[in-house]
């Protein structure tokens, strides 16, 4: 893992052994200052500010800067499409607040769409910028109608050299951030993300990050409070780094789910410096079993390092029967191929839900379970530390107890 990261760093720096030129060149007279636009806000929630923002993008979206000033509020009653941006800098220092209109948002993919954009900074320089998905009505409706289709707050598909930083994202109707479509060189940094319901209905499916088909995605210095996966590595994610993250109330940092209806793969993932609070698991891998329409899942070169477990139900979990019941999996065992999976330097205390069990490793009987564990110092509240295992290697690195499931 370190090798690919170092090679990528060297390539990105463009290191050269050539000596610096002593020739002094006159300034290029063709270089101009970046154009700066500040959209005009309508001033109340009945006015959709998206057209004004779109106009600013038309004027300044090609190499320019769009500024939402500190203390300002913009009401977004429709999809904000950033597709016209090219090497643009969008500085959100005020509040972008989306409408809660469940009829309008029904079936829509995104609230902010970033499709095939090359060069985008969506950021707050002051840390005061907020993007509010206003998802309460969507969560309440979904609680009574699970067929209601909700949009992702920020949906990236394709494109390259994208930076999202310094912002607070709050209350998305569904997922916070999604990356797919072959996007490459995407950085999320210094983000505060929270989904908090004011009713008895939880903010369901509010994944922090769904990383699908993409390469070289980095997530760093992020705090997430939500009600689903904190980070999910979806099919075809490759070369993803997560460094310094705190997740509260989540389903953990997860590979998958994979293999539901096709052959899926996830590879070259490195996660380090995670604090997992009140999560169903700190980290894990979720794969569907064989049989039916399910495909084969391949997971390779994945490292989970330096995790602090704080009242999470499991420290680590492998599920090879995801989405099916035990009877099905007796007839159709898991066949996922797991290779070079490293779990290292886990510490802390689980919740009492499964005490004395702290981890549940259910590798598929018809698959491959190439996993190693080291520096695993997690205990249940009782002080015990049992690890349930099935079909794991003899040199796993921890003492196993039979009885794994999932």
Curated annotation (Swiss-Prot):
Glycans are attached at residues 278, 301. One of its GO terms (cellular component) is extracellular region. The keyword Signal applies. Keywords: Carbohydrate metabolism, Cell wall biogenesis/degradation, Glycoprotein, Glycosidase, Hydrolase, Polysaccharide degradation, Repeat, Secreted, Signal. Residues 1-18 form the signal peptide. GO terms for biological process: cell wall organization; pectin catabolic process. The keyword Protein biosynthesis does not apply. Gene3D superfamilies: Single-stranded right-handed beta-helix, Pectin lyase-like. The active site is at residues 228, 251. One of its GO terms (molecular function) is polygalacturonase activity. It is found in: Secreted. Belongs to the glycosyl hydrolase 28 family. Pectinolytic enzyme involved in the degradation of xylogalacturonan (xga), a galacturonan backbone heavily substituted with xylose, and which is one important component of the hairy regions of pectin. Activity requires a galacturonic acid backbone substituted with xylose. PANTHER family: ENDO-XYLOGALACTURONAN HYDROLASE A-RELATED, PTHR31736. This is Endo-xylogalacturonan hydrolase A. It comes from Aspergillus tubingensis.
């Amino acid at each position: 893992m370190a090798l690919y990261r170092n090679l990528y760093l060297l390539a990105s720096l463009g290191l050269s052994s050539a000596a610096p030129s002593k020739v002094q060149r006159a300034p290029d007279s063709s270089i101009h200052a970046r154009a700066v636009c500040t959209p005009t806000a309508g001033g109340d929630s009945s006015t959709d500010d998206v057209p004004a923002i779109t106009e600013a993008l038309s004027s300044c979206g090609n190499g320019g800067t769009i500024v939402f000033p500190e203390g300002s509020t913009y009401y977004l009653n429709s999809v904000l499409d950033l597709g016209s941006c090219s090497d643009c800098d969008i500085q959100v220092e005020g509040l972008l607040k989306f409408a809660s209109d469940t009829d309008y948002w029904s079936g829509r993919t995104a609230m902010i769409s970033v499709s095939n954009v090359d060069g985008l900074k969506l950021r707050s320089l002051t840390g005061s910028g907020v993007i509010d998905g206003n998802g309460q009505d969507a969560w309440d409706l979904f609680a009574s109608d699970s067929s209601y289709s909700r949009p992702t707050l920020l949906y990236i598909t394709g494109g390259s050299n994208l930076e999202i930083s310094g912002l607070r994202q709050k209350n998305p109707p569904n997922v916070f951030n999604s990356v797919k479509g072959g996007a490459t060189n995407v950085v999320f940094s210094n983000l505060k993300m929270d989904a908090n319901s004011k009713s008895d209905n939880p903010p369901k499916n509010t994944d922090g990050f769904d990383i699908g088909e993409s390469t070289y995605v980095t997530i760093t210095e992020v705090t997430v409070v939500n009600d689903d996966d904190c980070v999910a590595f979806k099919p075809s994610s490759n070369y993803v780094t997560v460094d310094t993250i705190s997740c509260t109330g989540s389903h953990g940092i997860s590979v998958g789910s994979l293999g539901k209806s096709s052959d899926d793969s996830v590879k070259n993932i490195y996660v380090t410096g995670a604090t997992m609070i009140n999560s169903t698991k700190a980290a894990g891998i979720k794969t569907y079993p064989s049989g039916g329409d399910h495909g084969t899942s391949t997971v390779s070169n994945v490292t989970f390092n330096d995790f602090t477990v704080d009242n999470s139900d499991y420290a680590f979990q492998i599920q090879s029967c995801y989405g099916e019941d035990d009877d099905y999996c007796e007839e159709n065992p898991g066949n996922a191929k797991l290779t070079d999976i490293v779990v290292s330097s886990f510490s802390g205390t689980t919740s009492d839900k499964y005490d004395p069990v702290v981890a549940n490793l259910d590798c598929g009987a018809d698959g491959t379970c190439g996993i190693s564990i080291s520096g695993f110092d997690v205990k249940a509240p009782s002080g015990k530390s049992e690890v349930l295992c099935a079909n794991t290697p003899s040199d796993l690195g921890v003492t196993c107890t039979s009885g794994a499931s999932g």
